[in-house]
Amino acid sequence: MIAIVDYGVGNIANIERALKELGEAVIVTSDLELLGQAEALVLPGVGAYAPAMARLEETGLIEFLQEQATKKPFLGICLGMQLLFESSDEDGQTEGLGILPGTVEKLPSDVRLPHMGWHQLKNHGEAVYFVHSYGAVCDPDWIVDSVEYGRLVPAIVQKDLVTGMQFHPEKSGEVGLKLLKEWRETTCNSTQQSI
């Protein structure tokens, strides 16, 4: 069973629908016991970094998610991916979950923001749907795929059991479903592979 973390920030219904379309058993919850029983966790997110971190703190999820990320497959989507890092410079400096070393920084001012629409992944060679103005800055060894948008923007990162997708797989049609399926089949079944 996959649990989608419900903390009041995210495109939960579409993610739930996409995972169910792949035949997954899915629950949406903020209950720590149920989240702890799940085989894998998905952290969605839409909006701004600081309010999202505040919601995680209000719901008592921060330490729990930090611990769970060392025990089971953990997928952050869009803002959920950004929250995995140590901090963001959005609206000042905001501390993140610190599950992945690295920061989240505003995309360059010489490109149109937000970065919205379809963009081709360099390694997978297929287009996925993005909506964001900030992107991760992290160790290149963890970047599974990326796009160029004013700078190199990590689109998929993976370290140990933790995976992040900056784009919205649930809004990326068949390609998004394929990438979610790859995450489920590889990351959830073996920590030695990457998507």
From Swiss-Prot:
PROSITE patterns reported for this sequence: GATASE_TYPE_1
S-S bridge residues: none
UniProt key word Nucleotide-binding: no
Gene3D superfamilies, alphabetized: 3.40.50.880
Location (main, coarse): cytoplasm
Subcellular location: Cytoplasm
Transmembrane segments: none
Residues forming the catalytic site: 78 (nucleophile), 168, 170
Protein name: Imidazole glycerol phosphate synthase subunit HisH
Origin species: Exiguobacterium sibiricum (strain DSM 17290 / CCUG 55495 / CIP 109462 / JCM 13490 / 255-15)
Gene, per the UniProt record: hisH
